[in-house]
Amino acid sequence: DYRSERRGNVVKFGKWIAKHRIIILVISVLLLIPSGIFMATTRINYDILSYLPKDIETMKGQDILMEDFGKGGFSMVMVEGMTDKEVVETKKKIEAIDHVADVVWYDTIADISLPKEVLPENLYDFFNSENSTLMVVFFDDATSGDGTMAAIEEMRAVTGKQCFISGMSAVLTDMKNLSDKESVMYIVIAVILVSLVLAVTMDSFLIPLFFMLSIGMAIIYNLGTNMFFGEISFITKALTAVLQLGVTMDFSIFLWHSYQENQLRFPGDKERAMGHAISNTISSVVGSSVTTIAGFLAMCFMSFTLGIDLGIVMAKGVVLGVISCVTILPSFILTFDRAIEKTRHKEIIPSMKKLSSFIVRKSWIFITAFVVLLIPAIYGYTHYDVYYNLDSTLPKDLDSIVANSKLTDEFNMSSTHMLLADSKMKSKDVNMMLKDMENVEGVSFALGLDTLIGPAIPEEIIPESVKSILKSDKWQLIMIGSEYMTASDEVNA
């Protein structure tokens, strides 16, 4: 019948794999070369905001900032223990860095020979605390754009230890560096731990090595083929290898156990045993892998398009993992069969027949236990807190975290926002709006062009180079500081 014919064709395919194992290994090794090159040249996107829907207010505001002001991200730079002249020199160094659009300090508004004390009080408080002064640095790239992060790195190099660069751009720069530095380390740790567990639970010390090699090759193929997407996010890059290892390991274990069973059916004919093992694996694994792939592809329907990025890459990884499991792994096992046999050992894990028999006989106990445990599980699921602050779990000694803490301590400024208002608003209305904002609980300051220059100075006499920083033909830029932490419920309210 049709089912028997189809199974026969799958067995033939398995036997063909077993027969041509050397060719398959050679081709799979050669494919690592372009995959490795593509993996190294695939652009990694660290701009997490680029995955947000384009029609939300935040993204619209960022687009206006770029189009009308030539600005994207910004950072607060706190300077300690410098004279005014030294601050001016530092400011000039920062202004000379690529992707720095503007640097605003109090000398942008007034000459440094003018005592700071004669400045408007709110302007003085914004730029100064007891022991330090503050500069605002605007970048011509997005908050987490490549250009912005490169500028952050160079700013750290030229400013020295007396300058503390805070803000989301600095945090994302540190996250990028941390991810690049540690991703290889935790992949190695995962491989070592999984290999140790497999070496103990399997009946050969060597077979875990071939599991890891075949899965590792599939991971490289997966990361290499990402080149066809143009770029992937740094989160996808960091998660892919470990996720793919965990998701596809079961396929390899199933193939190995099926091969052992078929060796008993066909003693002395390893190729035939492997052919049937491949057939059994395809029949069993395809169904489970399809549900896994569907689960990852479901992420593609998220409005936050990072889900598309991660979902497609992981679905592709599962497909490549299945292909590797029924082609590369069998070729490894048959080619190195003698070495595997020499490293065989008695199974360390005892037989679970008594336990499985008890579970079957007393199934009602386990059903009852799971129903009872479901109640606290549902309660916990609906009552735990979710955090959205990216820097809350980062090491406290990172440059950006230290800078953010100092900014909070010295200036009572835990987060900063940009507000775009119509440039045609009258100064009186703008100042009234800013005063209303400052009266909102948690707002530490609200500054626009009018508050920077003061009500006594006509806007017409302000140099265009100064005015263009905060005002365009259509919009004016207002900075709002908050004493609440970024992404907290309080600041969102």
Specify the residue positions occupied by each region the protein language model found.
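Membrane-embedded transmembrane helical bundles of large multi-pass transporters/channels
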Residues: 1-44, 143-388
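Conserved short-loop catalytic and cofactor-binding motifs
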Residues: 49, 78, 298, 343, ...
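Juxtamembrane extracytosolic/periplasmic "stalk" immediately C-terminal to the first targeting helix
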Residues: 49-55, 214, 238, 391-396
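Structured non-transmembrane domains adjacent to transmembrane bundles in polytopic membrane proteins
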Residues: 54-75, 79-172, 392-493
